[in-house]
UniProtKB/Swiss-Prot annotation:
Name of this protein: Lysine export transcriptional regulatory protein LysG
Boundaries of every HTH lysR-type domain copy: 1-57
Mutant phenotype after disruption: Deletion of lysEG decreases the extracellular accumulation of L-lysine, L-arginine and L-citrulline.
SUPFAM superfamilies: Periplasmic binding protein-like II (SSF53850), Winged helix' DNA-binding domain (SSF46785)
Similarity annotation: Belongs to the LysR transcriptional regulatory family.
Gene: lysG
Summary of the function given for this chain in its UniProt record: Positively regulates the expression of the exporter LysE. Induction requires the presence of a coinducer, which is either intracellular L-lysine, L-arginine or L-citrulline. L-histidine also acts as a coinducer of lysE expression, but this amino acid is not exported by LysE. The lysEG system prevents bacteriostasis due to elevated L-lysine or L-arginine concentrations that arise during growth in the presence of peptides or in mutants possessing a deregulated biosynthesis pathway.
Keywords on record: Activator, DNA-binding, Transcription, Transcription regulation
DNA-binding region (UniProt annotation): 18-37
Top-rank taxon, per record: Bacteria
UniProt key word Cell membrane: no
Listed GO MF terms: DNA binding; DNA-binding transcription factor activity
Length: 290
């Protein structure tokens, strides 16, 4: 297959549109369209859904994976020839809580490589693998232990969340000495964040009806919303600890939520991907529970 056409397909998916790809590649939108049509004609399949944003079809996902691997290996070959690790694109999927707590030391490691670049795709830990399956990323922080086809898995450790709220919010929902979990307003990071719902299943008898749910799609803002009484939420213990110590929030109970975390990456002979894996594992050893 034509590597230029594969690179164009990858640009469409990464930029989300034919127009975005044309800007990234410094070619006209019609040239982008012609390259994709030629590739589709070659494989005999439609590869891109012309939606907003543009998405790869099932056949397109196979080629996107191939294209991303090609780009990585080409960059590594170029770096080896020039004697340095440079201009190597590393794209991974990660959840917000990991990004805001234990993951930052990875930035130091990648920065020391010289010209390597790191692109993070933010997604709930229950859904990061979908990006890996589609070929959108090289690796993913996930709660799923079963490997995606063509990938290998490394256990990272356990992320602990604590159920917290302001004392006044807790007191407002105490009924006959018991906390009314179902009635108390709750916070979510986004529509895919079901951690609070899974946690609530163990605390409420029977199905939970309509609840007051606020969406706060920011790791820092989420903690701040809890601190200011917008609702209760599950916060990583490292973020909750300062607020608990200051008395700004309280534990709603003594039951922590422990989520095993894993790193899944393509099974690919790549020096930079191996180094990235080592960096992720080292950061997890320092920042997660065993």
């Amino acid at each position: 297959m034509n590597p230029i056409q594969l690179d164009t397909l990858l640009s469409i998916i990464d930029e989300g549109s034919f127009e975005g790809a044309s800007l990234a590649l410094s070619i006209s939108p019609s040239a982008v369209s012609q390259r994709v049509k030629a590739l589709e004609h070659h494989v005999g399949r439609v590869l891109v859904s012309r939606t907003q944003p543009a998405k790869a079809t099932e056949a397109g996902e196979v080629l996107v994976q191939a294209a991303r691997k090609m780009v990585l290996l080409q960059a590594e070959t170029k770096a080896q020839l020039s004697g340095r690790l440079a201009e190597i694109p590393l794209t991974i999927a990660i959840n917000a809580d990991s990004l805001s707590t234990w993951f930052p030391p990875v930035f130091n490691e990648v920065a020391s490589w010289g010209g390597a670049t790191l692109t993070l795709r933010l997604e709930d830990e229950a859904h990061t693998l979908s990006l890996l399956r589609r070929g959108d990323v090289l690796g993913a922080v996930t709660r799923e232990a079963n490997p995606v086809a063509g990938c290998e898995v490394v256990e990272l450790g356990t992320m602990r969340h604590l159920a917290i709220a302001t004392p006044s919010l807790r007191d407002a929902y105490m009924v006959d000495g018991k906390l009314d979990w179902a009635a108390m307003p709750v916070l979510r990071f986004g529509p895919k964040d079901v951690l609070q719902d899974r946690d609530l299943d163990g605390r409420v008898d029977g199905p939970v009806g309509r609840r007051r749910v606020s969406i706060v799609p920011s790791a820092e803002g989420f903690g701040e919303a809890i601190r200011r009484g917008l609702g209760w939420g599950l916060l990583p213990e490292t973020q909750a600890a300062p607020m608990l110590k200051a008395g700004e929030v309280i534990l709603l109970d003594e039951i922590p939520i422990d989520t095993p975390m894993y790193w899944q990456r393509w099974r690919l002979e790549s020096r930079s991907l191996a180094r990235l894996t080592d960096a992720v594992v080292d950061a997890a050893i320092e920042g997660l529970r065993p």
